From Swiss-Prot:
Gene Ontology terms: cellular component: cytosol
Taxonomy, superkingdom: Eukaryota
Region (Aldehyde dehydrogenase domain), start-end ranges: 417-902
Subcellular location: Cytoplasm, Cytosol
Active site: H106 (proton donor), E673 (proton acceptor), C707 (proton donor)
Organism: Xenopus tropicalis (Western clawed frog)
Annotated domain remarks: The N-terminal hydrolase domain has an NADP-independent formyltetrahydrofolate hydrolase activity, releasing formate and tetrahydrofolate. The C-terminal aldehyde dehydrogenase domain has an NADP-dependent dehydrogenase activity. It catalyzes the oxidation of formate, released by the hydrolysis of formyltetrahydrofolate, into CO2.
Subunit structure comment from the entry: Homotetramer.
InterPro entries noted in UniProt: 10_FTHF_DH (IPR011407), ACP-like_sf (IPR036736), Ald_DH/histidinol_DH (IPR016161), Ald_DH_C (IPR016163), Ald_DH_CS_CYS (IPR016160), Ald_DH_CS_GLU (IPR029510), Ald_DH_N (IPR016162), Aldehyde_DH_dom (IPR015590)
Name assigned to this protein: Cytosolic 10-formyltetrahydrofolate dehydrogenase
CDD domains: ALDH_F1L_FTFDH, FDH_Hydrolase_C, FMT_core_FDH_N
């Protein structure tokens, strides 16, 4: 189809490019005249392609079409006019001229928000749904018949830029191309616009963007974000006009600490804080703005309002002076109308536009591999000297990144001061949950509350997912070299090691883990896991594949291993930090971003980890931590359309429910590590001393709260009595007590509900006829302590033979001497298949049994010997997918095949 493209901007350029790819003939491009010697991106591209380009300053004079302009247009004989973004008024003689007429892109769901400031009004009026319309052009009042519409959710802190970049631009380009395709196929609809709900909103200009303070905080927030970046919502303080950018609504929380700032007409003084400027509505609610712009165009972080500029300019090294001149040359290439770039040259006063900001940022980033630079940084350092000082400071690591504000709960415990975050961690900040909702997390040693923890709500989950998506699609994490990503993960492991005693102490008081075990395993293996996967970051690679050639041409096929995107991770309460590390390390190494839900009863080490991740330099939005109810958070993550992968460790029933939700939703990739009833077979030819020692560890390690715990021991008859005698003797030596006591062997169970289930489990075993040899009851002391327990004479049909206790309960059954196949049949007679073990000195028997056992892990003459390099995961209803080892990366990668013909 012969098309005339009428419009301008990067959006117009992308539509033009895609139409060419579709095979359409663009017979002409009509765009705006050059500005300061620079062509509009649409016109510049078309000129390079040899397409006729027309740059009429106007199409009409005194309401009448200019005949010469119309004739030049008609000479092209276009069959369709496509107006992706057009700021000029096009006469109806041109609109109606082509065979198929004209189509226009409009960034709202018509008939709502007609007019040139549709995106602004969508946000200013707090619409929950936004989107765009492609309609058949009319006389300029946006009332033409609708061809196509697409909707998107408007996020609470969306600005004009974020909703445009996230949806209106990329999906709008696709929509324009689809609309042209429908027209070419003869299938394009013409749907009359409804009259109900129609609005025509005036254009937002600087003069009508003054903030009205006599309204609720949410309305003020919507007004500021609806004018961000153009024209900019403003107020007057003293004799200075201040324009606000980067608004976020604060739904609750305590009064902010900082310096007051009187704003005429405001409900109460604003407060300059470490994170921004807190403003108040007439309802007493709060919002915060990130940046302030002065009348001269200079922009600063709002948190710096009362601070003077750095007292002394940096003294540049010879290398930095050379770099400065290279950047000066880049400014000169952009500001072609300026004869010389002086230190005082102002980027914008010299004629730069928003597209030039993008170009400058990309040029500097190209010269400084790995430098994190954003468009807004240019607005904050508009003069050349300021810009160089800012870039050099950043290269030196003196970039003045905003300080992470943590409302710690401090505890004097374990001979140290432990500082514990307790809020949600979203987009690099600790914040309260919506409505200020909290719950108590309890110390199982004495049953007392440690602190109140924020309880995430649906809006918090959506905000976290949006932050993770933004970080993946547009943030530094997604653009970073894999080796640089690995360096950050190595740094994270180092920082975790520096804080290992504090992490282990928090783990002990929150989960009941014995401190020495927490230090070695809970925390120690977490550190090892991040180090291991840090090393994988730059070793993820595809392969080349020989395929049949399309003779006489040749073909090359190769594969790419790519990150999935936003991953939801849900972890259990038995190893709070280690389970986080097992999944998150592989996920991050693959290049994904994470929204993680720790167990509701053990959230504290995950929140401390979030704090340490900021210290390590992990960018905002890459890691998000949401404490709260699994039924709410886990369900929402499973249902959320922007989450592309769920990694879950927990019970089999919940795992099934998650898998179903992921299938019904957007067919997410899922990995599940579920329940277990791991068999441990001990033959009479074993090293009995070692078998007793490892058998006890297989059951009582970490109080039995161990996914691979030996749920059932099968003993050859000839050693049964001796084994039981020795185990009982060793159990009696175990010290039960405070997990922070270095001599303690056995700490409290994780939480009260679990303790009650263990008591009920043992009562069931006794009722069914199993012999309770030792334990079986709660320890008479404060806290959730349960005695190590031993059952014998357990037969296959009993409840305790089939169901997992997830506690310190040893279930012992006999089998006849030499009957290997029979004991294998009994061991495999379960729907679980997470782990297993065998003790024997006969290598042939060991290999035979390890082959026949239906489990993801088989331990031979050892138990619980997991390693970061060895894959971990189960069979059958114990789930699928692997943690640890190279195979874990597969859970967080997708494979793309690329075929080239040449």
């Amino acid at each position: 189809m012969k098309i005339a493209v009428i419009g301008q901007s990067l959006f117009g350029r992308e539509v033009y490019r895609e139409l060419l790819k579709e095979g359409h003939q663009v017979v002409g491009v009509f765009t705006i005249p050059d500005k300061n010697g620079k062509a509009d991106p649409l016109g510049a591209d078309a000129e390079k392609d040899g397409i006729p380009v027309f740059k009429f300053p106007r199409w009409r004079v005194k309401g009448q079409a200019i005949p010469e302009v119309v004739e030049k247009y008609k000479a092209l004989e276009a069959e369709l006019n496509v107006l992706p973004f057009c700021s000029q008024f096009i006469p109806m003689e041109v609109i109606d001229c082509p065979k198929h007429g004209s189509i226009i892109y409009h960034p709202s769901i018509l008939p709502r928000h007609r007019g040139a400031s549709a995106i602004n009004w969508t946000l200013m009026q707090g619409d929950k749904i936004g989107g765009f319309t492609i309609f058949w052009a009319d006389d300029g009042l946006d009332t033409g018949d609708i061809l196509l519409q697409r909707e998107c959710e408007v996020l609470p802190d969306d600005t004009v830029n974020t909703i445009y970049n996230r949806f209106l631009f990329p999906e709008g380009v696709k929509g324009m191309v689809e609309a042209v395709r429908l027209i070419a196929e003869g299938n394009a609809p013409r749907i009359k616009q409804a009259t109900e709900g129609a609005t025509y909103d005036p254009m937002q200009k600087k003069e009508n963007a003054k903030i009205n303070w006599d309204q609720p905080a949410e309305a003020i927030h919507n007004f500021i974000r609806g004018n961000d970046k153009v024209p900019g919502a403003w107020t007057v303080v003293g004799d200075q006009q201040l324009t606000f950018f980067g608004s976020s609504f604060i739904s609750n929380g305590p009064a902010p600490d900082g310096q007051p700032l009187e704003i005429p007409g405001a409900f109460r003084p604003a407060v300059v804080t470490k994170t921004g400027l807190v403003l108040f509505g007439n309802d007493g609610q709060k919002l915060s703005v990130k940046n302030i712009q002065f009348e001269d165009g200079k922009m600063i972080p709002a948190s710096q309002y009362y601070k003077t500029a750095d007292s002394a300019a940096l003294q540049l090294s010879d290398e930095e002076k050379k770099f400065s001149e290279e950047i000066r040359a880049a400014w000169k290439r952009i500001l072609t109308n300026v004869s010389e770039i002086e230190d005082s040259t102002d980027f914008f006063k010299a004629g730069a536009a928003s597209m030039d900001v993008v170009r400058l940022v990309e040029e500097v980033k190209l010269k400084c591999n790995g430098l994190q630079l954003q468009n807004e940084d240019v607005y904050m350092a508009t003069k050349f000297e300021e810009f160089i000082q800012m870039v050099v400071r950043r290269l030196r690591g003196e970039d003045g990144e905003e300080e992470l504000v943590v409302d710690y709960v401090e505890k004097e415990i374990n001979n140290m001061t432990v500082k514990i975050p307790h809020q949600l961690f979203i987009n690099g900040q600790f914040i309260d949950a919506e409505g200020g909702k909290t719950y108590d997390t309890v110390n199982p040693t004495d049953g007392t509350a440690i602190c109140k923890v924020s309880l995430a709500q649906v809006s918090d989950i959506d905000r976290a997912v949006a932050a993770a998506k933004e970080a993946f699609e547009n943030g530094e994490w997604g653009k970073m070299n894999p080796r640089d990503r690995g360096r950050i993960l190595y740094r994270l492991a180092d920082i975790m090691e520096e804080h290992q005693e504090e992490l282990a102490t928090i783990e002990s008081i929150d989960s009941g883990a014995v401190y020495t075990l927490a230090l070695k395993t809970h925390v120690g293996m977490s550190i090892q896991t991040f180090r291991y996967f840090a090393g994988w970051c730059d070793k993820i690679q595809g392969s080349t594949i020989p395929i049949n050639q399309a003779r006489p041409n040749r073909n090359l096929t190769f594969t790419r291993r790519e990150p999935i995107g936003v991953c939801g991770i849900v972890i259990p309460w038995n190893y709070p930090l280690m389970m986080l590390a097992w999944k998150t390390a592989a996920c991050l190494a693959a290049g994904n971003t994470v929204v993680l839900k720790p167990a509701q009863v053990t959230p504290l080490t995950a929140l401390k980890f979030a704090e340490l991740s900021v210290k390590a330099g992990i960018p905002k939005g890459v890691i998000n931590i949401l404490p709260g109810a699994g039924s709410l958070i886990g369900q929402r993550l499973s249902d959320h359309p922007d989450v592309r992968k769920i990694g879950f460790t927990g019970s089999t029933p919940i795992g099934k429910h998650i898998m179903k939700s992921c299938a019904v939703g957007n067919v997410k990739k899922v990995s599940l590590e579920l329940g277990g009833k791991s068999p441990l077979i001990i033959f009479q030819d074993c090293d009995l001393d070692k078998a007793v020692r490892m058998g006890m560890s297989s059951v009582f390690f970490n109080k039995g709260e161990n996914c691979i715990a030996a749920g059932r021991l099968f003993l050859e008859e000839s050693i049964h009595d001796e084994f039981v005698k020795r185990v009982v003797g060793e159990v009696k030596k175990m010290k039960i007590g405070d997990p922070l006591d270095r001599s303690t062997d056995h700490g409290p169970q994780n939480h009260k509900a679990h303790l009650d289930k263990l008591i009920e489990y043992c009562q069931t075993g006794v009722k069914e006829g199993a012999k309770l040899v030792y334990g079986g009851k709660q320890v008479e002391r404060p806290g959730f302590f349960f005695e190590p327990t031993i059952f014998t004479d357990v037969t296959d049909e009993m409840f305790i033979a089939k169901e997992e206790s997830f506690g310190p309960i040893m279930i012992i059954s006999k089998f006849k001497d030499g009957d290997v196949d029979e004991v294998l049949k009994r061991a495999n007679n379960t729907e679980f298949g997470l782990a297993s073990g065998v003790f024997t000195k006969d290598i042939s028997k060991a290999l035979y049994v390890s082959e026949k056992l239906q489990a993801g892990t088989v331990f031979v003459n050892t138990y619980n010997k997991t390693d970061v390099a060895a894959p971990f995961g189960g069979f059958k209803q114990s789930g699928f997918g692997k943690d640890l080892g190279e195979e874990a990366l597969n859970e967080y990668l997708k494979t793309k095949a690329v075929t080239i013909e040449y």
